[in-house]
Amino acid sequence: MAFLKKSLFLVLFLGIVSLSICEEEKREGEEEEKQEEENEELSEEELRERRAWLDKLKSIGKVVGKVAIGVAKNLLNPQ
């Protein structure tokens, strides 16, 4: 009878340990998913910021180009 009790105890113990390991792996997987989602959100925010900077640079480039053309016209055709 003692042998059966020890065997049953061992089986239950191993089952609990394996269950605990599975739950830990599940938690780690969920944490990784959350981190990936946060990284995607950050990359979307970074893309928005980059687009805003590119739009500003484009506007500045247009203004500088117009000024350069005006200066070149005045230098080539003085009146």
From Swiss-Prot:
The keyword Secreted applies. Has antibacterial activity. InterPro entries: Frog_antimicrobial_propeptide (IPR004275), FSAP (IPR016322). It holds the Pfam family FSAP_sig_propep. Keywords: Amphibian defense peptide, Antibiotic, Antimicrobial, Cleavage on pair of basic residues, Secreted, Signal. Disulfide bonds: none annotated. This is Raniseptin-3. It comes from Boana raniceps. Expressed by the skin glands.
